[in-house]
Amino acid sequence: MENIQLEHSKPIPAFYCCYLLRSTVRHASLYIGSTPNPARRLTQHNGVVKGGARRTAAEKLRPWEMVMIVEGFMSRLGALQFEWAWQNPGYSRHLRSEEEGLEAPGTTSTTKPKTTRRAKSQTPQPLEFERDPSVSKSLGTPKRKNQRRRRPQRSLTTHFADLHRLLQSPYFSNWPLRIRFFSADVYQSWKAWYDRVDIFLPGHVNILLDGSCPENSAQCSAVGARFGSVEQAKVNYDIIQDYLEKAMFLLDDPKDLSCRVCQTQIAPKEQLAVVCPQAGCHCTCHLLCLSKKFLDAMPEPDCLIPRHGACPACKATVQWSLMMQELSFRSRGEQEALAILKRKRRLDRRQQVISKAKCAGKGVDSSDVRPTSVDLDRSNNNASDDLLLDDDWFDEFASESDSDTGHRSKALSKAAPNLETVVEDSEGDDLEFL
């Protein structure tokens, strides 16, 4: 219970994903995990740094490559739930309910996939059984009760099928998730498999092409921008720092601040307020007012949380998850938000000095200096502008560790306190999500 309360007291993570690894030596060897930092996690699996998983520790299978990820999770707990269900489809209640004929909210098609073959992973196997005296010894020794079960090996297309069914399930179908491919041949395999099924993914689940995949000209939004590679994945809050600065500037002086929906005054210190993420829009609204407006415009009547909506001022389509990420970071991580803006202000000043020098060389007057939009020192008047965050601050703030790391050695358990925390492998049989 304490972990759940701590999870809800943190901001929505800047990035969290479930990933699929493939051995570059043997493509049939696959592994599923979750992480807030794909680049760091991949180095752990490949043994470059400590903290990998037991199933990826074999040197004969290394190096591993991250071929695809499912991103957009709003909490670490949500990513762990999805990871466990993807790893154990035969035991997940989300896929059992889907097999029993429960449709995801908002879906209209009831046609089953053309390929109706049941994957081996979808059939739960008994975890333990007693020895039957009538069974011949030639059949082998039954497993002990406390013996770790062996997960049946699944093919790439089976992982595709399980992922497809999870995204159709009632629990996950309304989450703002996206699938990002880093490997061109894996994307082609997905495309060939997906073309053979009759049920489409929910309309809001986008397919993003990255890495060695061909570029998609339609993939131009901020949330769908290409990383280029796993190592270049944007996993910190820098991607929303301009949005964060604008929101803090608009809400800093609430004297003439009013809700664009209900037209009443907004009290930022007493009420939750959201700001349009569009750069040129200054629309501010009460959280409840805007959510009700978005929900009324959604086609699904039973939806409890909006996915997107049109800004009341600029009419641009804005993502609800992006607005909630900014709101949670502004309200739950104020000190970290101020530190980010301090660093941004310092970089802006440095850029202005460079621009001035270039303009001076060309004889152009460039004395205009953009003033700081927000009083960054209001929470600590003695704080210095040089007090900035370390480069790895997000690794400690967003998540203590990834979902599944290798078992600790005795030496690691006695490591210095400033070393990165390593969590036990998430594949343990004692994990259970109700």
From Swiss-Prot:
Residues 104-113 have a biased composition (Low complexity). It is found in: Nucleus. It comes from Aspergillus clavatus (strain ATCC 1007 / CBS 513.65 / DSM 816 / NCTC 3887 / NRRL 1 / QM 1276 / 107). GO terms for cellular component: Slx1-Slx4 complex. This is Structure-specific endonuclease subunit slx1. The gene is slx1. GO terms for biological process: double-strand break repair via homologous recombination. Its EC number is 3.1.-.-. Residues 14-97 form the GIY-YIG domain. Its cofactor is a divalent metal cation. Residues 96-154, 362-381, 399-434 are annotated as: Disordered.
